[in-house]
Amino acid sequence: MPRAARKQTLPMREMADLDAVHLGLDENEADIAEELQDFEFNTRSEASESNGGDSSDSEPSISSVSTATSSLAGSSKRKTKKPAKQSPQPAVETKSSKSSAKNKAKREPTPEELNGGKKKKRTDSGTKKTTSSEASDKVKSKSPDTEDRQPSAKKSRTKIPSNANDSAGHKSDLSEAEDEKPSLPTLESDSESSDSDSGTQHKRNGGNGGGNGRGKPSSKSSTPEKDSVGGGTHSHSQKGYDYMTKLNYLFRDTRFFLIKSNNSDNVQLSKNKSVWATLPQNDANLNQAFKEARNVLLIFSVNESGKFAGFARMAAPSRRDIPQVAWVLPPSISPKALGGVIELDWICRKELSFNATLHLHNTWNEGKPVKIGRDGQEIEPKIGGELCRLFPEDEQIELTPILKKSKETARVMREKGIHVIYKPPRSLSSRGHGGGGRGGGRGSNHDHLGPMRHKRSYHGAPHHRPYRHHHGMGLPPGGGFKRSGSPYRQMGGAAGAPPGGPGDMAMPSWERYMSSAAAAEAYVADYMRNMHGQLPPLPFVPPFAQLPIPGAGAGAAGALPPGAAAAMYEQLPPPVRYYDGPGAPPLPDYPPPQRPPPPGFDKAPSYEEFAAWKNAGLPTVPPPGFPVYGGAANGGSNGAGGLAAAQAAAAGGGMGAGGGSGGGMGGPGGYRNRDGNNGSAGGRRREYGNRSGGGGSSRDSRPFRERGGGGGQRSYRDNRR
């Protein structure tokens, strides 16, 4: 590119920024949008590009006119822009003159052009400010500035007049460049002489398919605009602005992956040789993404470095027919363990500190900061784009060839009818799905073994499907299944559980039991334990046998394990109500309201203890088919001896001392000495008469005594009666 163009770079950059301020304000935007439609550029980015191009009047440099000439013309254009609006036709004529002028400029930028270009650019930057406002005016009144520009007597300016199309100041700037470009031949010649930016122009022109014609319909000749956009890319002054436009184009239909390396030497090797290799499972994911997306960008980071090392585009799927580079590998990994060689096009080899990315959180990795992720972690596209925009521009890398590849890929995808579908990776976290070697966590594959064996599928809507017990139990109506918690997604949610269902973070206690009967019982106990002290006394809750399970719909029968007939409960005597006994009971005194202890305060009892208290009030010999849990092993509460002792205590009526012994322990320890509980329960119960043989109520008294405290406090069941 001519030296003048380089000199102009600074002022042009300023102008480009000014133009950017006004981006997308005018009607031209719509025109641009139409032009760019085929282009696959974002209208906004295109407009910005064209603006950028305009701002660097040197866009002509794109058209291979020396940037100086174009900048001169551009500056004169800007100055004369309002008049320059003349008519698109003059622009066309000027195009031919432009092309010749451009060629001339290319051949021999006169010192005047060089210096003048510089000066003009500066003035342009000054004028541009006004131009931006003027531009809008121009858009409205496309006065024939072209004539004025022509008076400037520079053919490049004449080209600019073709910009008459420019409606907005920035757009007019762009269109100036475009006007210069408008003659496609000019563009081509420009592209030959001009930097790779011209390549961009070609792309756009090709995309436009004779953008000139198309451009003309737009208030500015869109094609010129595109050209100018491309030209803007060429002109260094526009370059800073154009870089973002190019990135925006590159981020279309793109997937982003985090690549973590244990060794900075490997990343340096990759930057030098433009290849990478990763583990086979990541290899497969990247290859799949390469088939489905227009671009696959890899964002590199070295572990413990505190920064990103740059980002690159996959140029091809991994190949095993290429020899591996001499990577620096830990002794535990053989080079043969790696996948194929992935060819890369580096877009930025510069580093970016993690501190600059703290505001970005990857929603595809449970909302963790984007810097956190394992090797091969996919980044949500919007966040990936934001992250890549934070990298400084790498001036040593020419983006145009990469953009051409991207455009070609897009064309192939269009022909094949492939549409990029953005969906989070199957394994939302490393604990997720057993697949892909990504550590199927606690609940990977065993579907039939019982609680928490759900195979996790993350394709559906919210991240947890309604909890459905695998034994045909309709347990909690709509929800309650929780993923194992991550600190970033703490409340898996007992959202759909019955009112007041357990809201604790751990897996619900009823999920721990293998049989549905045990699970149902545990569910009830959990419900009681959690709601104790938070609800007014509830109506009588019969023993588990008659209890309709919440959400079961059909009552108890609906919740029974598949093999158990509902009739098995008919053999049990109806529960004894305390008011069936002699005399009217005194009003129970309710426990003072208490703050529920923090979740996890009272860990669920062991399976044996749970079974023991559960069966305490049932007949000594359970009906056929009823699950037998603890036998008399746990203190004999459900054995004949335990029941006899309890009944004797209740009937004797005098065991006040015993009454305190069990309850006095309070807290979780209270129910652990089950013998004391059973014995003492009768002592407390004498007031009510021998209502359920002592055992029945001891069954209920256990879970609540743990919260209760002193022996004087009645059990939950006593309170409610």
UniProtKB/Swiss-Prot annotation:
GO molecular function, a single term: pre-mRNA binding
Biased composition (Gly residues): 432-443, 651-670
InterPro entries assigned: YTH_domain (IPR007275), YTH_prot (IPR045168)
Keyword Nucleus: yes
Chain residues that bind RNA: K260, S261, N262, W276, W327
Keywords per UniProt: Differentiation, mRNA processing, mRNA splicing, Nucleus, Sexual differentiation
One GO CC term on file: nucleoplasm
UniProt biased composition (Basic and acidic residues): 135-151, 699-708
Disrupted gene: phenotype observed: Mutant flies survive until adulthood but exhibit flight defects and poor locomotion. Flies display sexual transformations dues to Sxl splicing defects.
Biological process (GO), any one: sex differentiation
Acidic residues: bias regions: 29-38
Protein name, entry field: YTH domain-containing protein 1
Organism: Drosophila melanogaster
Top-level taxonomy: Eukaryota, Metazoa, Ecdysozoa, Arthropoda, Hexapoda
Gene encoding the protein: Ythdc1
